[in-house]
UniProtKB/Swiss-Prot annotation:
Enzyme class: transferase
Assigned EC number: 2.3.2.27
Record keywords: Cytoplasm, Metal-binding, Stress response, Transferase, Ubl conjugation pathway, Zinc, Zinc-finger
Domains as described in the record: The RING-type zinc finger domain is required for E3 ligase activity.
PROSITE patterns: ZF_RING_1 (PS00518), ZF_RING_2 (PS50089)
Subunit structure: Interacts with ATP1/SDIRIP1.
Species in which this protein is naturally found: Arabidopsis thaliana
Protein's job: Possesses E3 ubiquitin-protein ligase activity in vitro when associated with the E2 enzyme UBC8 in vitro. Plays combinatory roles with AIRP1 in the positive regulation of the abscisic acid-mediated drought stress response. Plays a positive role in abscisic acid- and high salinity-regulated seed germination through the ubiquitin-proteasome-dependent down-regulation of ATP1/SDIRIP1.
Molecular function GO labels: ubiquitin protein ligase activity; ubiquitin-protein transferase activity; zinc ion binding
Tissue localization of expression: Expressed in germinating seeds, flower organs and siliques.
Protein name: E3 ubiquitin-protein ligase AIRP2
């Protein structure tokens, strides 16, 4: 059953708050600032309040009545709010920004967990342990293969849908199409600098540096979003009257 506007708006607010919590864990090196997001809606949203009650906030976002503004915050409490902000849609938030932050957070957690498992395994493993639970060499090779050319090459991951392929196949495919070859998701806003780096188990020691690079790519993606100027159709978000 479709959520009401009020319920879907509460869910969106909660997701943005969670995304802000995740983003606060990744301050930039040169100034210590970190990405934060807030809702902004058009004054016309009040005029359409009655209609909005029967839809969800995604519909309001598609009509341009609701946007997400991105700014930077600092540990001293200062922000670039209303001074230097970029805008994005609810769809881009759920398709790119939120999944990217979740992937960064989950990836670092996975790295720490795998390192702890490796330490325990080396310390307490038995000499007669068999390889029954290990993947075969053929399975490992298939895991590293590009899904298009079936060659074992360094792969990249599309930030919009998380499908992976080797960089050569990506370039060849992108020259002919603007959609993912696996799910047909749009790649119109995805450039080579936005791609994530696919890592295998042999590269576990370098994962922290790679996640740092992935954070850099996420920030580059944000920097390409439209800059908010003096747009009268975008005003600070406040709860709509009941």
């Amino acid at each position: 059953m479709r959520k009401s506007f009020k319920d879907s708006l509460k869910a969106l607010e909660a997701d943005i708050q969670f995304a802000n919590t995740l983003a606060s864990e990744y301050p930039e090196e040169y100034d210590g600032g970190y990405v934060q997001m807030r809702l902004s809606y058009s004054p016309a949203a009040h005029l359409f309040l009655f209609l909005l009650q029967w839809t969800d906030c995604h519909f309001a976002g598609a009509l341009g009545l609701l946007r997400i503004l991105i700014y930077k915050a600092y540990v001293d409490g200062k922000t670039t709010m209303s001074l230097h902000e970029r805008k994005t849609s609810i769809r881009e938030f759920y398709d790119v920004l939120f999944p990217s932050l979740l992937q960064l957070h989950g990836g670092i957690t996975d790295v720490e967990e795998r390192k702890q498992k490796e330490i325990c395994d080396k310390r307490y493993r038995k000499k007669d342990r068999t390889d029954k639970g290990k993947m075969s060499e053929i399975d490992l090779e298939r895991e590293e293969e590009c899904g298009i050319c079936l060659e074992i090459r360094n792969k990249v991951v599309l930030p919009t849908c998380n499908h992976s392929m080797c960089i050569n196949c990506y370039r060849n495919w992108r020259a002919r199409s603007q959609s993912c070859p696996f799910c047909r998701g749009s790649l119109k806003r995805v450039n080579s600098g936005d791609l994530w780096i696919y890592t295998c188990s042999a590269e576990i020691a370098d994962l922290p540096a790679i996640y740092k690079e992935n954070l850099k790519r996420l920030l580059i993606y944000i920097d390409k979003l439209p800059l908010v100027t003096s747009d009268p159709n975008l005003v600070p978000y406040a709860p709509l009257p009941r």
